[in-house]
């Protein structure tokens, strides 16, 4: 069986589709959103994170690395991602648990076994399995095999997607799911590029195609300060959705859950110290969608 690179399997998830769900997070994403809450999801490779607070500078990790991917400079541990082979020797060597890995190759059989552990909860709550990321469609061959195995157990399947997928791949994968949780970040392609590193034409085309195929879609808008949180942005996004024919939308207020991860990955975080948004901050924003006839909720 094809293996997949997974960075988390989260049980009892209640925000990634209906009911109680198990969410399977795949590594790899074509976008580079400046506010990304899961920066460890972007790379399609295993990554090593260093927690300075736990490190005692014993340097056993440096000595254990057969690929010279780890160095210590100015009392900080640095991992060269180009040299790192993901062998995890350094992680197992560190007695202080200062090093951890993001990403692990897993067999489909193991993932299905974990997913089935909570089948009773899915059935009682109307839940199921959600594929997320990164980009849920970032590993297409693995995903097809995984879905095939999960469907043998009559599980409700959802997928979180950026929509930034080659047309042929999206057309093949999207119909496999009972629900598409489809990120819609901006109506303006240039603003979209500024915030995510990619333009939005391909995303919108895939969204339109999915709608006209009759697929179940829940558009979800991450509301991000200085990117798409103005009333004008809300109006533009509402117009985009209604022009396609969509009837509902979920708003996801900006949060700071991922800030610590950037520190551990030695990455600059563009939204450091930016205040999180609350539902009550977005009343007028929400009303723009409601005025256009959309069922808009959090």
Please provide the spans of the model-predicted regions.
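Auxiliary Fe-S-binding modules of radical SAM enzymes
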Residues: 1-18, 218, 223-298
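N-terminal pre-triad scaffold of radical SAM enzymes
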Residues: 7-60, 77-86
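Fold-independent oxyanion-binding glycine-rich loops
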Residues: 9, 27, 39, 81-82, ...
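Hydrophobic packing within well-folded, soluble alpha/beta domains
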Residues: 33, 55, 65, 70, ...
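Iron-sulfur cluster-binding cysteine motifs and their immediate structural context
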Residues: 34-41, 60-79, 89-105
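Extended, non-globular alpha-helical segments
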Residues: 50-56, 103-110, 118
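Conserved AdoMet/S-adenosylmethionine-binding subsite of the radical SAM
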Residues: 109-258, 263
């Amino acid at each position: 069986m094809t293996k997949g690179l997974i960075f988390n399997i989260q049980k009892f998830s209640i925000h990634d589709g209906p009911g109680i769900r198990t969410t399977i997070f795949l590594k790899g994403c074509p976008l580079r959103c400046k506010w990304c809450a899961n920066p460890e999801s972007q790379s399609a490779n295993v990554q090593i994170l260093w927690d300075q607070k736990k490190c005692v500078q014993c340097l056993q990790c440096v000595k254990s690395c057969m690929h010279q991917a780890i160095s210590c400079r100015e009392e900080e541990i640095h991992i060269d991602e180009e040299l790192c082979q993901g062998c995890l020797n350094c992680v197992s060597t560190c007695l202080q648990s200062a090093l951890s890995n993001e990403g692990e190759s897993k067999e489909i059989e193991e993932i299905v076994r974990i997913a089935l552990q909570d089948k009773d909860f899915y059935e009682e709550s109307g839940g199921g399995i959600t594929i997320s990321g990164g980009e849920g469609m970032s590993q297409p061959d693995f995903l097809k095999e995984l879905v095939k195995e999960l469907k043998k157990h009559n599980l409700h399947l959802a997928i979180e997607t950026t929509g930034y997928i080659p047309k042929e791949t999206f057309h093949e994968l999207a119909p496999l799911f009972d629900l598409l949780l489809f990120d819609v970040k901006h109506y303006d392609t240039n603003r979209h590029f500024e915030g995510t590193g990619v333009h939005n034409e391909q995303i919108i085309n895939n969204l339109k195609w999915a709608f006209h195929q009759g697929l179940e879609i829940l558009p979800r808008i991450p509301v991000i300060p200085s990117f798409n949180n103005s009333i004008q942005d809300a109006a533009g996004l509402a117009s985009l959705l209604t022009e396609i024919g969509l009837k509902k939308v979920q708003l996801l207020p900006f949060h700071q859950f991922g800030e610590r991860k950037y520190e551990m990955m030695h990455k600059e975080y563009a939204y450091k110290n930016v205040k999180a948004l609350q539902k009550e901050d977005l009343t007028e924003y929400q009303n723009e969608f409601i005025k256009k006839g959309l069922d808009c909720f959090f």
